[in-house]
């Protein structure tokens, strides 16, 4: 009976160890790249490169934040940028709306 309990415990610990091992390396594998094509798809940028297993996007991506709609024709029509979060500023986008953006 003791041998059976010990065998079941060893199998359970082995199963748990394998599960954790696969989960840890599965998370890391998602952040890595093998070819430039992987990076082109991730960055949505034809100039992206895979360097030492890490994607490097050639162009900067613009982050936008949703704000209340303010109509504009130029950036001067938008309110002061101090109303935007840090490192953001107001810009008049093509659709004629002021939006806080970060470049």
Curated annotation (Swiss-Prot):
Q: What is its main location?
A: secreted
Taken from the UniProt record, the cysteine pairs bridged by disulfide bonds within this chain are: 33-50, 39-55, 43-57, 72-92, 78-98, 84-100
Entry's family note: Belongs to the DEFL family.
Span of the signal peptide:
1-29
Could you tell me what this protein is called?
Defensin-like protein 290
BP GO terms, sorted: defense response to fungus; killing of cells of another organism
Enumerate the UniProt keywords alphabetically: Antimicrobial, Disulfide bond, Fungicide, Plant defense, Secreted, Signal
Q: Which GO terms describe its cellular component?
A: extracellular region
**Subcellular location, record wording:** Secreted
């Amino acid at each position: 009976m003791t041998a059976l309990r010990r065998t079941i415990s060893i199998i359970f610990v082995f199963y748990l160890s394998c599960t954790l091992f696969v989960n840890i390396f599965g998370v890391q594998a998602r952040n890595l790249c093998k070819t430039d094509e992987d990076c082109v798809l991730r960055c949505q940028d034809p100039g992206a490169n895979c360097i030492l297993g890490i994607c490097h996007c050639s162009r900067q991506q613009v982050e936008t934040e949703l704000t209340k709609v303010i109509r504009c024709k130029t950036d001067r029509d938008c309110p002061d940028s101090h109303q935007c979060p840090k490192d953001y500023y107001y810009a008049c986008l093509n659709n004629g709306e002021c939006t806080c953006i970060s470049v």
